[in-house]
Design a protein with these regions (language model features):
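Short loop/turn motifs that connect adjacent beta-strands in outer-membrane beta-barrel proteins
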Residues: 43-48, 88-93, 145-148, 187-198, ...
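Exposed, low-structure sequence patches enriched in small/polar residues
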Residues: 135, 228-236, 240-470
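Sequence/structural signature of outer-membrane beta-barrel proteins
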Residues: 58-60, 66-69, 104-106, 149, ...
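Bacterial Sec-dependent N-terminal signal peptides
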Residues: 1-16, 470
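Outer membrane beta-barrel
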Residues: 93-94, 98-104, 129-205, 218-240, ...
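N-terminal periplasmic/intermembrane-space "pro-region" immediately following the signal or transit peptide
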Residues: 10-77, 85-94
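Low-complexity, highly charged intrinsically disordered N-terminal segments
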Residues: 72-116
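Outer-membrane beta-barrel transmembrane domain signature of Gram-negative proteins
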Residues: 111, 117-143, 164-171, 242-268
Length: 470
């Protein structure tokens, strides 16, 4: 499933710009039951425009929390995010503008410091003053289209892959990255019932901590045959060296030319998913491989030592009731045990690319480097309302340190839709042990904890959205 400004209906216009796991479940149930999976970048209706308003309020008792909420930052304290979204769609051109006004009343919290690739995890406070009392523009951009071909530029949030909790390569955990793109607007017929979808994108310039420019270049290719879907993507993080001249023109074609490829970080990602509409079941498996030079050795020899995976299922109309559903998702990015003997690079660990983060948050799997993440959930969903309860178990630094960070979390989300108004409530209760890797072996055997090891956080988010269609 590719969620790139997908539209279930006009009533969900702004909601699908601001994706979260509940919205993905609502969208998927609609698609699975009706046998429709729309990937369109903009609505089908021509010569139309819509105006939406969203008001978010949050309260948080400790360290930052929440993943996959379009890069929104919820530190200790309370605050609000006020936003508007205007978009226009015609036969050949579409554009959207999404100003956001952010007010954070943040309370200082002293936490053990996390370093390196763990410094961009979601529970680490951001220092930038940009996150407080600032005006930002999100989901803003321009698209030109002819027939089924689209090209344009914007900073819309993206998601690639069949998961709703994680993707190995692209999620909306971080703010949307400004990028250029070209691709098809939806699945296009190829042969018989076989259809395809394609997108090629290159990010605008980003800068690492040394001030060097770098880019993300990627393509996505999907094939669908009836209820079976195959996906492949390739991501190259390129640039990042002050002594190697590199520009956006180079980034535009690096996927084709392979120029300086031995210096760049590459991920090749695959997934397969199967839908069973008669039973309301969806199952999937996503696997990804890092590609590095290993000191001039052939990376293909060691590709199995770099594999990450994400697998899961979602079942709608469960236990004989149309409104009941359940599912699980398990992501594994644990670094191999023999990393100090056999070349075994870690996911998202390159400082030259800010550990695969944008403005302090990782754009791929939020659990991050050397981690695993298990989510199980059950819920009630109908056309107007939903309530979903989930339990999450997550570990960070599994190979890096003993004991690793361990997170237990319970969560509940409630939504209600009335005409063009959508109300969303999300509450999470999080408990972490060994935060910041402050504990060592003796703490485990003695069942003791160092100061700062145990962290508890409760976070509440309330969102009210309304959309006008013209």
């Amino acid at each position: 499933m590719i969620c790139f400004l997908s539209f279930v209906s006009f009533a969900f216009s702004q909601i699908t710009y601001n994706l979260n796991p509940t919205i993905l479940l609502l969208k998927e149930k609609y698609s699975l039951i009706n046998g429709i999976e729309k990937l369109k970048i903009f609505p089908i209706k021509k010569d139309s425009f819509q105006l939406g308003f969203t008001q978010n309020y949050y309260y948080n008792t400790n360290h930052p929390n929440f993943e996959n909420h379009n890069g929104f930052y919820f530190p200790k304290g309370f605050g609000s995010i006020s936003s508007a979204l205007f978009y226009y769609n015609s036969k050949y051109i579409s554009f959207s503008i999404g100003p956001h006004r952010i007010i954070n009343n943040e309370y200082h919290k002293v936490l053990p410091q996390k370093k390196d690739s763990f410094s961009v995890n979601n529970d680490v406070p951001l220092e930038s003053i940009e996150n407080s009392k600032s005006l930002k523009f999100r989901n803003t951009g321009l698209s030109l289209h002819y027939s089924s071909l689209y090209l344009g530029y914007g900073n819309w949030n993206q998601w690639w892959g069949p998961g709703i909790h994680n993707s190995l390569v692209m999620t909306n955990n971080a703010e949307g990255i400004a990028h250029y793109f070209v691709g098809t607007s939806d699945y296009q017929p190829l042969v018989g019932d076989l259809k395809y979808y394609f997108k090629y994108m290159v990010s605008d310039v980003m800068h690492n901590n040394a001030g060097a420019k770098y880019f993300l270049s990627a393509y996505y290719f999907n094939l669908r045959y009836n209820n079976i879907e195959l996906g492949k993507s390739r991501h190259i993080l390129n640039g990042g060296y002050n002594d190697i001249p590199w520009s956006i023109n180079d980034a535009m074609d690096v996927l084709i030319t392979q120029n300086n490829i031995k210096y760049w970080d590459e991920i090749v990602d695959y997934y397969i998913s199967a839908n069973f509409p008669s039973s309301g079941l969806k199952i999937f498996l996503e696997v990804g491989f890092l590609n590095r030079s290993f000191n001039e050795k052939d990376p293909k020899v060691y590709s199995d030592h770099t594999m990450g995976s994400n697998l899961g299922l979602r079942k709608y109309s469960a236990f004989g009731y149309d409104e009941l559903m359940f599912g699980f998702e398990y992501t594994r990015l644990v670094q191999g045990l023999y990393y100090d003997i056999i070349p075994t690079p870690n996911w998202y660990d390159n400082i030259k690319y800010n550990y695969s983060s944008y403005r302090g948050r990782r754009w791929a799997a939020h659990s991050g480097a050397d981690s695993d993440d298990f989510l199980v959930f059950i819920g009630y969903i109908n056309d107007r309302a939903s309530i979903i309860y989930g339990v999450n178990y997550e570990r960070h630094g599994v190979t890096y340190h003993f004991p690793p960070e361990v997170k237990f979390e319970s969560r509940i989300s409630v939504s209600f839709k009335y005409k063009n108004t959508f109300i969303y409530l999300n509450y999470e209760n999080e408990y972490i042990e060994h935060y910041g890797f402050v504990d060592v072996n003796r703490n485990v055997w003695n069942e003791t904890f160092e100061p700062g090891s145990i962290q508890r956080t409760q976070t509440l988010l309330i969102s009210i959205e309304h959309t006008f269609s013209f």
